[in-house]
């Protein structure tokens, strides 16, 4: 039996370094190639030794697909292609292709130029890697080769994020990457058609969370920021360059304008300009409201939000700063946090998920003393708030996607083991499908039922529909009767009449014959007349004919009477019928065996 194998090289019962290997129909596809922000050694990269022991991946992989530009999904791409060795195609959407190299270069500068780390990719490697990228359009079916095809769907989450359907023959897999089932201030909700894949591989970051009202969260966020600046404190909001940053900037910009507030709001230098450029360039990826108003008013040109200079961090008085990256693991956000952590007037608001090992994760878990580089200890006195503006699907959203796609099997990645276990049970109970949650390096094998596509002739379809009843769908299948014709390796279901005509054949008639013996003193003609009268009284809804040639006809059934030569009173009744009337023929033979009424 054919099967599909799925092996997480990263993000198996874990969040970070997303990298899923899928083997389907003899093809090997790598889904995402991310980096783990909680590690500073080789553990930050996926373990490619599961694929091959002798280095290069080109001979093994048919293609690599990147779902979006976040570093936990694309951060290891130059390492994989240029240092381990891969020359094949890398697929991603146009916005991801544009933004991905900028974020990779920013992270490389922090890691290599500032921290002095070795065994890391260079600027040239990023450029060489991006030359291998093939851009994807939404809903466009791309033929990777003669057998493998891929198709991208809108995922929300961040600009350019996509879910991907992979098909080889009749087998298919859908990989969600990160997605969001609710629209926000700048992006739409994820959408996929009822593609019924053999496996749906879904993220499960918020596997046990059902978020409260977005409006309540926004109100709480604005209240906390306002209260902090009113008492003279500083607010740090760690964000990733594109995504939640724009969402919260639009929110604060509107609030500052309405309340006529004067406290300065800053954003990491350069990133606002870049964000603005890409949102203009890829306006079709934003939500309907922004697309409609973009010509008159660009939502991303902020009046109250200015570019940040590192010297501003020491300025007295209140301020709000959006700084990257979002998990406080490096860069400007971490530098500002170190400066402001000692003052209880200040506040840090964490708007998204933080992986284990990052400073963000530590302070959210209540750590008040942090060991920094060089064995220095940092006392955390500022207020720490977690407000989920994360653009990941919650438990409700994941269930909604399953209802949309109707997969035959489910596989969870990109989440914490305990939470995944809870969601796994819920999915199996509600949808009666198998759900898997493999750890890193663990292979899940799913046996598929090969389906054979069949074209149905229009005439046959019209005839079936004329019979009435509900239209067929996945939950209410309908049996269709016809003749299968195989020609040029394709199958068609047609009516038997059409099949005979196309093949130039004559229809054969299959008939059954039955003899019934009956004692009757009357002549053969009288006996036949009595049979006719009896059948007329029993079969009131049928057309019954008494033909002059000495036969009675009911539908296709022919009845004749002859006498036995040895015994004139013994009549032999001969019944003959076609296979369509087999049920009626059996009924009549049983009826006549009981005799005729006197």
Swiss-Prot record:
The active site is at 203. GO terms for biological process: regulation of RNA splicing; RNA polymerase II transcription initiation surveillance; snRNA 3'-end processing; snRNA processing. Zn(2+) 2 binds at residues 72-73, 178, 414. Its EC number is 3.1.27.-. Zn(2+) 1 binds at residues 68, 70, 157, 178. It comes from the Eukaryota. Keywords: Cytoplasm, Hydrolase, Metal-binding, Nucleus, Zinc. Component of the Integrator complex, composed of core subunits INTS1, INTS2, INTS3, INTS4, INTS5, INTS6, INTS7, INTS8, INTS9/RC74, INTS10, INTS11/CPSF3L, INTS12, INTS13, INTS14 and INTS15. The core complex associates with protein phosphatase 2A subunits PPP2CA and PPP2R1A, to form the Integrator-PP2A (INTAC) complex. INTS11 is part of the RNA endonuclease subcomplex, composed of INTS4, INTS9, INTS11 and inositol hexakisphosphate (InsP6). Belongs to the metallo-beta-lactamase superfamily. RNA-metabolizing metallo-beta-lactamase-like family. INTS11 subfamily. PANTHER family: CLEAVAGE AND POLYADENYLATION SPECIFICITY FACTOR FAMILY MEMBER, INTEGRATOR COMPLEX SUBUNIT 11. This is Integrator complex subunit 11. It comes from Danio rerio (Zebrafish).
């Amino acid at each position: 039996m054919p099967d599909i194998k799925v092996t997480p090289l990263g993000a198996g019962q874990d969040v970070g370094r997303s990298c899923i290997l899928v083997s389907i129909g003899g093809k090997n596809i790598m889904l995402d190639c991310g980096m783990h922000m909680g590690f500073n050694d080789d553990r930050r990269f996926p373990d490619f030794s599961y694929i091959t022991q002798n280095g290069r991946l080109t001979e093994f992989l048919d293609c690599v697909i990147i779902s979006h530009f976040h570093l936990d999904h694309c951060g290891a791409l130059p390492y994989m292609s240029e240092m381990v060795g891969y020359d094949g195609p890398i697929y991603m959407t146009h916005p991801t292709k544009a933004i991905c190299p900028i974020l990779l270069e920013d992270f490389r500068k922090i890691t290599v130029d500032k921290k002095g780390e070795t065994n890391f990719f260079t600027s040239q490697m990023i450029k060489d890697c991006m030359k291998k990228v093939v851009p994807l359009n939404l809903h466009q079916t791309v033929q990777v080769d003669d057998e493998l095809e891929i198709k991208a769907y809108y995922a929300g989450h961040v600009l350019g994020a996509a879910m991907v359907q992979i098909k080889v023959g009749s087998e298919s897999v859908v990989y969600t990457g990160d997605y969001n089932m609710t629209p926000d201030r700048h992006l739409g909700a994820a959408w996929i058609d009822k593609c019924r894949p053999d496996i749906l591989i879904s993220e499960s970051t918020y596997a046990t969370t059902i978020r409260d009202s977005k409006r309540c969260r926004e109100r709480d966020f604005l209240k906390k920021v306002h209260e902090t600046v009113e008492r003279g404190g500083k607010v740090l909001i760690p964000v990733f360059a594109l995504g939640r940053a724009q969402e919260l900037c639009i929110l604060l910009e509107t609030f500052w304008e309405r309340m006529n507030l004067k406290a300065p709001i800053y954003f990491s230098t350069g990133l606002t300009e870049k964000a603005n450029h890409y949102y203009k360039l890829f306006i079709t990826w934003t939500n309907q409201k922004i697309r409609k108003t973009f010509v008159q008013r660009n939502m991303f040109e902020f009046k109250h939000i200015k570019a940040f200079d590192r010297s501003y961090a020491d300025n007295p008085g209140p301020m709000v700063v959006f700084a990257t990256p979002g998990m406080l693991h490096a860069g400007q956000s971490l530098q500002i946090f170190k400066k402001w952590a000692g003052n209880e007037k200040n506040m840090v608001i964490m708007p998204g998920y933080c992986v284990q090992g990052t400073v963000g994760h530590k302070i959210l878990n209540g750590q008040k003393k942090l060991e920094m580089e060089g064995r220095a200890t940092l006392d955390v006195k500022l207020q720490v708030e977690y407000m989920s503006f994360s653009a990941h699907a919650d438990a409700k959203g994941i269930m909604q996607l399953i209802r949309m796609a109707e997969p035959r099997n489910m596989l969870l990645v990109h989440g914490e083991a305990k939470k995944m276990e809870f969601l796994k049970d819920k999915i199996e109970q509600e949808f009666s499908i198998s759900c898997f949650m493999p750890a890193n390096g663990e292979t899940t094998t799913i046996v598929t039922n090969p389906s054979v596509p069949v074209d149905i002739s229009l005439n046959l379809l019209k005839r079936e529909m004329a019979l009435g009843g509900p239209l067929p769908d996945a939950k209410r299948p309908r049996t269709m009767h016809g003749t299968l014709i195989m020609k040029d390796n394709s199958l068609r279901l047609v009516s038997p009449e059409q099949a005979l005509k196309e093949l130039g054949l004559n229809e054969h008639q299959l008939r059954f014959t039955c003899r019934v013996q009956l004692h009757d003193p009357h002549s053969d003609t009288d006996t036949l007349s009595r049979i006719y009268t009896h059948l007329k009284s029993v079969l009131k809804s049928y057309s019954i004919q008494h033909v002059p040639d000495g036969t009675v006809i009911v539908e296709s059934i022919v009845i004749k009477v002859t006498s036995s030569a040895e015994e004139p009173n013994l009549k032999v009744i001969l019944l003959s019928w076609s296979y369509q009337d087999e049920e009626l023929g059996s009924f009549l033979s049983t009826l006549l065996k009981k005799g005729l009424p006197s």
